[in-house]
From Swiss-Prot:
The keyword Iron does not apply. Belongs to the dethiobiotin synthetase family. Substrate binds at T41. It comes from Mycolicibacterium vanbaalenii (strain DSM 7251 / JCM 13017 / BCRC 16820 / KCTC 9966 / NRRL B-24157 / PYR-1). GO terms for cellular component: cytosol. One of its GO terms (molecular function) is ATP binding. It catalyses: (7R,8S)-7,8-diammoniononanoate + CO2 + ATP = (4R,5S)-dethiobiotin + ADP + phosphate + 3 H(+). ATP binds at G12, I13, G14, K15, T16, V17, D49, E108, G109, A110, G111, P197, A198, G199. This is ATP-dependent dethiobiotin synthetase BioD. Homodimer. Its EC number is 6.3.3.3.
Length: 226
């Protein structure tokens, strides 16, 4: 099984763009790739993360279980829509069915690592632990990111879940002292796999492909699918 879970230190941190960039890089290097988003909220406002991944990355193997209209945490969004979150078993079945030998299967969470995404209160951390999958954490570059990143990494370590490193989700065109210092500090916490420029999600396919192919170390990505 070659599953990589993608989480973030918060909502709106750039998980979907990071997932798309990694998926795009893998595709351009000849790696079979699938993307799972078990729970999606905010569809009423046009949020459709898998559609965004398809637009940016050109990936067609896309898998989801539950979609809720309001841009809320999954549990609240499900309750307000009169529905229930999927079960933990359903989420695990979705991911294992999408994965296959030689394929890199990316699993994007909703919100942060410890947000409830299943009907029994299970979180993305629980899913990663069940799968024995490493977790890539998307982080912000600005003030507050060090504390948020450490908390997420400690939450992974508490369950003996491997960290696959960090992606800076929105690196500014003109970084200030805080961003530059934070990038150095983040690299001491875990490997920084990429620093994606702010606004990358607004690029067209060709420009996004050029960005993605240079964003990650090809040997690291190939190792994920091995």
């Amino acid at each position: 099984m070659s599953v990589l879970v993608v989480t973030g230190t918060g909502t709106g941190i750039g998980k979907t763009v990071a997932t798309a960039a990694l998926a795009c890089h893998a595709r351009l290097h000849g790696i079979d790739v699938a993307v799972c988003k078990p729970v999606q909220t905010g569809t009423r406002d046009g949020d459709d993360d898998l559609a965004e991944v398809a637009r940016l990355a050109g990936v067609t193997e896309l898998h989801s279980l539950a979609r809720f209209p309001e841009p809320l945490a999954p549990l609240a969004a499900a309750r307000r829509s009169g529905a229930e979150l999927p079960t933990r078993a359903q989420i695990l079945d979705l991911i294992t069915a999408a994965d296959r030998p030689g394929r890199l299967t990316l699993v994007e969470g909703a919100g942060g690592l410890l947000v409830e995404i299943a009907s029994d209160g299970s979180t993305l951390r629980d899913v990663a632990a069940d799968l024995g999958a490493p977790v890539l954490t998307v982080v912000a570059p600005g003030l507050g990111t060090l504390n948020h990143t450490v908390l997420t990494l400690e939450a992974l370590a508490h369950r003996q879940i491997s960290s696959a490193g960090l992606v800076i989700g929105a690196w500014p065109a003109q970084p200030g002292v805080a961003e530059i210092d934070n990038r150095d500090a983040l690299s001491r916490l875990a490997p920084v796999r990429a620093a994606l420029p702010a606004g990358a999600g607004s690029l067209g396919r060709a420009d996004f492909e050029r960005l993605s192919v240079d964003a990650f170390d090809p040997s690291w990505v190939e190792g994920l699918a091995a």
